Amino acid sequence: IMKAAVVKGNSKVEIENFTISDVGSNELLIKMQSCGICGSDVEKVFGKYGQPSMRLGHEPAGEVIKIGDAISDFKIGDRVFTHHHVACYSKDCHECSHGNETMCKQYYQSNLNPCGLADNYVVPEWNVLHGGVLKLPDNVSYQEAALIEPLACCVRAWSKFKYQKNDTVAI
């Protein structure tokens, strides 16, 4: 049984129990050590988010505590950051081929179970096999690793700017 933070109404968060039967052959079970609280999490709690999942936390880092039979790239005890969703990145995918990976259908089918803000969570096969789990160097703390996804959002936004030398920008 795992415990996870779940939105249960307007401005109400509860801890809910989840049962995961086992880890699939290409899945990982992670003990969460740190998890960021994103603007979308805050919106789920206090706003009108309107998404089907009201589970919280998608910026987690933790320790591998169980591995599927077919996994050889990770071992128990590895310190990792896990992406909450992973797009297909196919040139045949309209969204991915136009730089809109967060709109990819596969992206929405690849979430952590039950969520990142849980004592333990399962990383699905798609994420494991498509680069959604990163081993952490020893000099990166779990707290720093929980900032990987927000930093990636900033880098992505910056890369979309069409700025030139001598332009004025607001930060």
Regions found by a protein language model. Name each.
Residues 3, 27-29, 168:
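Residues that mark the start of a beta-strand
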